[in-house]
Amino acid sequence: MAKFTQDELLEAFGEMTLVELSDFVKAFEEKFDVEAAAPVAAVAAAAPGAAPAEEEKDEFTVVLSAVGDKKIQVIKAVRAITNLGLAEAKALVDGAPKPVLENAKKEDAEKAKAQLEEAGATVELK
């Protein structure tokens, strides 16, 4: 079995789309029975006492909530936003609700939301 260096793995992951990476993480979690999310207790311990002032978010996740009647236009919009292939974009749209973009800048997230809504989809920014 071939062994890959950390640099080779990072290079391979760098070429993947966010949707492909998300699918990989899910498969990794299932195969090795682990969870990629940080433990909740560690987050709670970081904020003792009074709640900190709420910061303005600078990264957003664009979530495709519902497709609507214009499925083909939504698939085209997803392809334009994510650079996914036709099959991957269709799978993402068919699996709604699903994230289309993750950790996107506010400007990019709002632009993607507008494109998807124009195509007939229902979209949330988280």
UniProtKB/Swiss-Prot annotation:
GO CC annotation terms, alphabetical: cytosolic large ribosomal subunit
Lineage of the organism: Bacteria, Bacillati, Actinomycetota, Actinomycetes, Bifidobacteriales
Skewed-composition ranges (Basic and acidic residues): 104-116
Keyword Ribosomal protein applies: yes
Key words of the record: Ribonucleoprotein, Ribosomal protein
InterPro entries registered for this protein in UniProt: Ribosomal_bL12, Ribosomal_bL12_C, Ribosomal_bL12_C/ClpS-like, Ribosomal_bL12_oligo, Ribosomal_bL12_oligo_N_sf
Signal peptide bounds: none
Domain of life the protein comes from: Bacteria
Subunit structure: Homodimer. Part of the ribosomal stalk of the 50S ribosomal subunit. Forms a multimeric L10(L12)X complex, where L10 forms an elongated spine to which 2 to 4 L12 dimers bind in a sequential fashion. Binds GTP-bound translation factors.
Family per similarity comment: Belongs to the bacterial ribosomal protein bL12 family.
Species: Bifidobacterium animalis subsp. lactis (strain AD011)
Function field: Forms part of the ribosomal stalk which helps the ribosome interact with GTP-bound translation factors. Is thus essential for accurate translation.
GO BP field: translation
One Gene Ontology term of the molecular function aspect: mRNA binding
Listed name of the protein: Large ribosomal subunit protein bL12
